[in-house]
Amino acid sequence: MLKAVKSNFQVGIDNQFKLSEAATIADKSELDKKTLKKELGDLRQELAELQHQLFAEDKRSLLIVFQAMDAAGKDSTIRSVFNRVNPAGCQVSSFKQPSSLELDHDFMWRSNIRAPERGKIGIFNRSYYEEGLVVRVHPDYLKYQRLNDLPETLDEKNLQGFWQNRFESFNDYEKHLARNGTLVLKFWLNVSKEEQKNRFLSRLNEPEKNWKFSSGDIKERALWNDYMHAYEELINHTSKEHAPWYAIPADNKLYMRVQVARTIVENLRAMNPQFPKVEKKESEKFDEMRNLLESE
């Protein structure tokens, strides 16, 4: 079964993660812009090369999950880190409000059909983990799933066992993927409440960013503490050796992107994908084919 290598900001599997102790910004000594840009460029190039080998090998795959509060930088991080990767070997899926078709299936269905094929990198911009985050903060959403085992009162006390079952479903699914050749890496982009405020103000004050803002963002921000509670419990229950969480400081976007890229590259290095070897019967024809081409 595939397992991740240990990296910076990796959450342990001992159920001791404290969200209040997780950094949102690095030390100033680590924030030199020139140094970070150079490292990010090098990591992008290596990521492109490793992805090419993974695609050619066509035996294993990588699933990368991004979760965060609004304005943490999920979209821009995906765009930045993967900007040299061959689009043919990479697929990005965004998960928003479920459609009527998706609600007619179990809650993992829409994610499972978007899982990466062998040889590919799958990127989830939000994911099945919304079922233990936004749905937990807004338990009334469960009514639309037409489940037959819900308590009459959808409060935290009555739903505690329900959420434990969902955590088990997440873990079982990721273990199944790992056993079948898909490594799962999960990034929680940890933006501070103050930095989120600044980014929201930027979206309001700069016309070219207005489209990114919704009044609903402010309503969700008012539930910040509820979300932090949901994140802490979810991360503690679902960070595993085969599918770890990484709590990445997100107040400085460039630093965040470097940490994400570095973690992905370190894991692909450990996977060590190989170009397939040509069968001897075929390689024996190479000289003949070369001579035919050169004689044209």
Task: Give short role names for the model-derived ranges.
Residues 136-167, 176-229, 276-283:
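A glycine- and Lys/Arg-enriched "phosphate-lid" helix/loop adjacent to the NTP-binding pocket
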Residues 60-61, 119-121, 181-185:
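Loop/turn-to-beta-strand initiation segments
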Residues 30-39, 88-159:
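Conserved nucleotide-sensing/catalytic segment adjacent to the nucleotide-binding pocket
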Residues 223, 227-232, 236-296:
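NTP-dependent small-molecule kinase module
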